[in-house]
Structures are given as structure tokens and as C-alpha cells.
Amino acid sequence: VKSARAILRAAFFGVATVVWSGQASISIYDFSSQLNDRFANSSSFVAYAYNLSGIGLDNNGQWLTMISPNVFLSANHFHPSTGASVTFYASNDPNGLSVTRTVTSTAQRIGTSDLWIGTINEPLPNSFVYYDFATQDITSLGQFNSSPYKDAVAFIMGRSPTGWSTSQDMAVGCNKLDRWFDSITVGGTTDDAMGAVYDGPSDPNFVSSEARVESGDSGAGMFVPSAGGKLTLVGINWFQYTAGSETGSGFSYVGNYDGQIQSFLNAYSVPEPSVFGTVAGLVALGWGFSRRLRKSSG
């Protein structure tokens, strides 16, 4: 993998003060609503086989990806604010079952990264999913090259060019994870990052629905399919970059912060409402919630 570090120009995006009309939609090669819009509710949707009910956009257009029934990940530079309202949909049907929650003040930046972790006021019902997240430490190009994520084809979430209502403004593209950035500084944050080059159709790494993040996509999740038809949350959209003639997307890699994420989950995660009655008595006896108690993204 060639290094773009020395010549990288990273474009920090998704500033919270940017108005709705200034937020660009995700770039997807040969975009079509039926193929790429979640709420077109089409069987040809690129992520049709996967459950996206644990992904939400708040009323300000900021992203939440659930990692427990009440805990979410987002981007530090563009995260949901306390009191924001967010709607989650149980399916890709825009008229189907949905629930609305409020973002609480129990939230924090994860270390000095661009990751943000927070909570909603009430757990999602058990008909909604949350996602397992990457846990492998990757701190060098060599470790990335030997990891399961090198050249994996990822699903990249972003805003749609179609013009949906805010809570349904979700499009999905794909890209091959083929870049690693050591200690890149973007918008005042310095961290390692995973990357995906935005290739053209003639490039050998080009994939169908090839995608690149844009300004409205900060804080959305980047997922890699895992065993059993589930999705693993591997990254959170952080930046877009240009290096010579190359452009692409950069993601905060979740796996390097799994310990801090799990500590937050241990402190603040609660089970979905359906299990409150059966475990309430156990809580007083030191019962600890684990994000692995039920399947997470089937």
C-alpha cells in the first residue's frame, strides 16, 4: 500500500454550524435510489440482507450507531447534542414501525480521538438491533495489512442525494478498505485512521456502488459484514482526503478504543425494555450488563 501521508490534504467536514442545505450527500458511483437509498425499500438495495435498525439520524442530521440498546457511537466533531430527537426504523419501510428517542447528557469524547460515545433516554425495543464493533488493535501499516480488514469491502453510510426527510436521509455505498494513515491530523485531532480510495471503474480495486464520504456524512458508521449475516462496526466517518490525483475517505478505527468503549458500556448500558422485569432483581446483586447477551446485528 503506498503511503499518502506526506502529501495528504485532509478536508475536515461536518461542522455542526453548517446548515442543512450546506451538507453534501455521499458520492456513490452510478448512484440509484433503488440500489442505494435505504428507504426506497427495494429488494435490490445494496444492504438489503442486513439489519440497519440500529442506525439513526437525529433532528439536526447527526448520526447515531447503536452498540447496545441505549449506547451509540458518533464523531466527536459532529455528534448529536443533548436533547436532540432521533427516530429509528425497524425496517427499510419508511412507513413501518419506528421509535423516537432523546439524546441524553451522558456522553463523552473517547480519549483524544474523533470518536464520541453517548446514550439515549430509553433503550430500543428488542426488535431493533445494535452492533458488535471491531476489537483488534491496529497501530501500524503492517498490522493493517495482516488484519482481516485489509481489502475488505465495507458498507459506508451517508446522506442521500434524493431528498428524503431528515430521519430517512440514509444512503449506502461500498468501498474496499485499502489505506492506512499513521497519526494523521484533521481538524485538530491526531489519530491513526483507516482509509478507502475512491476508485474509478478501470481500477482493479473498484467495487459496485463505489463510495466516498462527503460533508453531511460525518459520524456515520462504516461496517464490514461478518459471519452469520451480521455487520461489524469497524469505523466512524471522519474525513475526506486528496493526495495528488487520489481521493478517498478516512475513518476513525473503532478497534483501537474497544477497552474504553466497553468501560462506558459497563457503566451506562441497560438492557432492552423486554428484559427489565426478569433482571431487575439481579441488578442489586451486582449483575453486569454485557453487550453480548443477545445477538446484536442479525
Features from the language model and the residues they span:
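Bacterial N-terminal signal peptides that target proteins for export
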Residues: 1-11, 274
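Bacterial N-terminal signal peptides
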Residues: 9-19
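Sec/Tat signal peptide C-region and signal peptidase I cleavage site
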Residues: 20-24
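C-terminal subregion of chymotrypsin/trypsin-like serine protease catalytic domains
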Residues: 25-56, 60-79, 172, 180-183, ...
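Chymotrypsin/trypsin-fold serine protease catalytic domain
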Residues: 121-210
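C-terminal membrane-anchoring or membrane-association module
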Residues: 288-298
